[in-house]
Amino acid sequence: MQRHATVLLPAKERFVMKIGVFVPIGNNGWLISTHAPQYMPTFELNKAIVQKAEQQQFDFALSMIKLRGFGGKTEFWDHNLESFTLMAGLAAVTSRIQIYATAATLTLPPAIVARMASTIDSISGGRFGVNLVTGWQKPEYEQMGLWPGDEYFSRRYDYLTEYVHVLRDLWDTGQSDFKGDYFTMNDCRVSPRPQQPMKVICAGQSDAGMAFSAQHADYNFCFGKGVNTPAAFAPTAARMKAAADKAGRNVGSYVLFMVIADETDDAARAKWEHYKAGADEEALSWLTEQSQKDTRSGADTNVRQMADPTSAVNINMGTLVGSYASVARMLDEVAAVPGTEGVLLTFDDFLTGIDAFGEHIQPLMRCRDHLRVTQEVA
């Protein structure tokens, strides 16, 4: 009879990077192309994705929030689920993987988010955290009368600072009397409180966004850059580390990449070229138009990178295209960038992509050696 024992590598030998999946809460995932897989977002699809991710030893799953899409032939992101309710359902059908929902802070009062997060903390057994976004796409909020005016672009992190203050009050103590320019709490209560310290994540790439993350977030997401240039985001991670060091805190960077992999480099490259050839130009034009409406935040924002025509077919997230071995090597290069704690992955086809990652890519990654801790014992 055989059994398995867990063998941990000595700390000095560990080279660890966390892996997450950016679940497709909107139709067609992250490829704005008529040649890409076309599908609607459903709970069953996302359940299958996150359960596969858990089986393949992914560390976390995150969903965005999107309230209006880009249109075009593919109706890109015109069809979306809601983040908190989706992740509550996924928390109930998983057991180990960390679960993160996104709060569109212009639409939800912080006291309500605090209570919803505490509820999902209970459902998940302490596996839940919150991603906070300020909102950049004006039509998402104008359609429901919630856009506060274009001056919001320049003061959104002041708003978010007050927002997170209320959240921390309620999660940490169960009570808040916070008084600010945007929020007024009068003996506001939340109970039960989370059983674990609630993790807050943000996705700031502008100086203001990074300054906020340095002060208030536990992790900061950033875009990877380019195609098969895995370390090109290093200056962004360095800026985040410098901001966190200045604040006296440790805030690691988590980097967004799309993986397009196959058995050979040529096969993977052929898929990538096929997707680019089918780019939905109408939807991409709408994205470009929206990105130009924020004239107050500078050129270093996430949305400016998303709309760059260089690789807009997948909103210019870093893209790793190649054989399983090539992608594994590139992800190890990502892990070697100072300040990097993890990656958030999307796939051209999530169901087959996650299995291929777990079976063919992850076993080749040095930064995932800690998973190979089982050995047969006679």
From Swiss-Prot:
MF (Gene Ontology): alkanesulfonate monooxygenase activity; uracil oxygenase activity
Catalytic activity from the UniProt record: uracil + FMNH2 + NADH + O2 = (Z)-3-ureidoacrylate + FMN + NAD(+) + H2O + H(+); thymine + FMNH2 + NADH + O2 = (Z)-2-methylureidoacrylate + FMN + NAD(+) + H2O + H(+)
Protein name (database record): Pyrimidine monooxygenase RutA
Keyword Oxidoreductase part of the UniProt annotation: yes
NCBIfam families: RutA (TIGR03612)
Function of the molecule: The FMN-N(5)-oxide reacts spontaneously with NADH to produce FMN. Requires the flavin reductase RutF to regenerate FMN in vivo.
Keywords from the named record: Flavoprotein, FMN, Monooxygenase, NADP, Oxidoreductase
Binding residue positions for FMN: I65, K66, N131, E140, R156, Y157, S206
GO biological process, any: nitrogen utilization
Lineage, uppermost ranks: Bacteria, Pseudomonadati, Pseudomonadota, Gammaproteobacteria, Enterobacterales
Pfam family, one: Bac_luciferase
Homology family: Belongs to the NtaA/SnaA/DszA monooxygenase family. RutA subfamily.
Keyword Amino-acid biosynthesis: no
EC number of the protein: 1.14.99.46
Disulfide bridges in this chain: none
